């Protein structure tokens, strides 16, 4: 039997970290060799998450570079923004492959990162090596990458909805409007007033209107796809459910003669080799429940011939395809494995 790949998770006690643990425990080719969580160092992981205690007996450890390099070949950094860039250079120097789930290595230009996220960066050479970790768009680059900046849930759902339109030049890029709705787990596990049950239940609210930090990330990739500078109108909303994301995208068509069947044919061809994307048939629109617990993004669309606009909808699990599952999908590519290996494709229903 082939030796299993030894992987580590830094930030193992958060929502992203525990999703990585859950998914990797069912991955046939890996072994979890290290769990890093400074605030819970010395605590058995099974005490933090008793539902997993029968599957993993590892103790959370302090985050120490030498220990990670000694224990692992691959490491996932499921840390808040601003931490990964202090760890990645040393991990790469130690010969590890690094998958960063934060925003630290998603940007081509570090000045853009600093203007939206703040903080000082002294890792420009390392950042230039990073590959944007959306497999459906950058699969071949990811295969050979040592450092992957994995996109989050809003960019993933938005970009998968927009990519065929921009790549094929089907829309006026200046008309791109993205309305996004996320479950409260997208805010992470740290205590925040807006995530409290009494605040979030039975309420839908927009936030960070015209200034959400994922805007420049979405625009960076949209511009790359379109071959020109693209600006988007992006508005996120918090909805009263634990997990799930629904994006509704609107754009003006360049060819008003296109109909929904034409657009579906274009999307099906674009994602034909993308096992994590399901393009739905005519008149079928995605629901967040379909994607719950899976690494699948569902896409539906309609052409409004009256307004000459296309409406594209995408639904995914913000903690799986929007975070941890996507990182594992990228890891699979770097190892030459089938990219959905170990990843769930069928959700819970009802």
UniProtKB/Swiss-Prot annotation:
Compartments, record wording: Cytoplasm
Catalytic activity: N-acetyl-L-glutamate 5-semialdehyde + phosphate + NADP(+) = N-acetyl-L-glutamyl 5-phosphate + NADPH + H(+)
E.C. numbers: 1.2.1.38
Active site: 153
Gene3D superfamilies given in the database record: Dihydrodipicolinate Reductase, domain 2 (3.30.360.10), NAD(P)-binding Rossmann-like Domain (3.40.50.720)
Chief place of localization: cytoplasm
Pathway entry: Amino-acid biosynthesis; L-arginine biosynthesis; N(2)-acetyl-L-ornithine from L-glutamate: step 3/4
InterPro entries: AGPR_AS, AGPR_type-1, NAD(P)-bd_dom_sf, NAGSA_dehydrogenase, Semialdehyde_DH_NAD-bd
Gene Ontology terms describing biological process: L-arginine biosynthetic process
GO cellular component: cytoplasm
Pfam families: Semialdhyde_dh (PF01118), Semialdhyde_dhC_1 (PF22698)
MF term (GO), any: N-acetyl-gamma-glutamyl-phosphate reductase activity
Key words, A-Z: Amino-acid biosynthesis, Arginine biosynthesis, Cytoplasm, NADP, Oxidoreductase
Main enzyme class: oxidoreductase
Biological role stated in the UniProt entry: Catalyzes the NADPH-dependent reduction of N-acetyl-5-glutamyl phosphate to yield N-acetyl-L-glutamate 5-semialdehyde.
Family: Belongs to the NAGSA dehydrogenase family. Type 1 subfamily.
PANTHER family xref list: N-ACETYL-GAMMA-GLUTAMYL-PHOSPHATE REDUCTASE, CHLOROPLASTIC-RELATED (PTHR32338:SF10), N-ACETYL-GAMMA-GLUTAMYL-PHOSPHATE REDUCTASE, CHLOROPLASTIC-RELATED-RELATED (PTHR32338)
NCBIfam families: argC
Name recorded for this polypeptide: N-acetyl-gamma-glutamyl-phosphate reductase
Naturally occurring in which organism (per UniProt): Gloeobacter violaceus (strain ATCC 29082 / PCC 7421)
């Amino acid at each position: 039997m082939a030796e299993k790949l030894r992987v580590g998770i830094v930030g193992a006690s958060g929502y992203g970290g525990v999703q990585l643990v859950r998914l990797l425990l069912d991955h046939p080719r890996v072994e979890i060799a290290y769990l890093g969580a400074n605030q819970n160092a010395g605590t058995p992981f099974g005490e933090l998450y008793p539902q997993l205690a029968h599957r993993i007996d590892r103790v959370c450890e302090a985050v120490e570079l030498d220990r990670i390099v000694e224990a692992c070949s691959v490491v996932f950094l499921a840390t808040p923004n601003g931490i990964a860039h202090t760890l990645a250079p040393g991990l790469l120097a130690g010969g590890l492959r690094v998958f960063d789930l934060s925003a630290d290595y998603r940007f081509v230009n570090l000045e853009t990162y600093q203007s939206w996220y703040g903080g000082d960066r002294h890792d420009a050479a390392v950042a230039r090596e990073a590959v944007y970790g959306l497999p459906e768009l950058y699969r071949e680059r990811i295969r050979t990458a040592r450092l992957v900046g994995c996109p989050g849930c809003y960019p993933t759902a938005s970009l998968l909805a927009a990519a065929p339109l921009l790549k094929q030049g089907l829309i006026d890029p200046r008309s791109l409007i993205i309305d996004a709705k996320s479950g409260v787990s997208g805010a992470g596990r740290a205590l925040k007033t807006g995530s409290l049950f009494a605040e979030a239940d039975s309420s839908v609210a927009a936030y960070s209107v015209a200034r959400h930090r994922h805007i420049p990330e979405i625009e960076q990739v949209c511009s790359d796809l379109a071959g020109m500078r693209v600006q988007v109108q992006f508005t996120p909303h918090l909805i009263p459910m634990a997990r799930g994301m629904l994006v509704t995208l609107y754009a003006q068509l360049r060819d008003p003669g296109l109909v929904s069947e034409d657009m579906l044919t274009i999307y099906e061809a674009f994602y034909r080799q993308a096992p994590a994307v399901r393009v739905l048939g005519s008149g079928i629109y995605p629901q967040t429940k379909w994607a719950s617990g899976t690494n699948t993004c569902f896409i539906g669309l309609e052409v409004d011939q009256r307004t000459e606009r296309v409406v594209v909808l995408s639904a995914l699990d913000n903690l799986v395809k929007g975070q941890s599952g996507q990182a594992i999908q990228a890891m699979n590519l770097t190892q030459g494995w089938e990219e959905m290996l170990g990843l769930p494709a069928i959700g819970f229903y009802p």
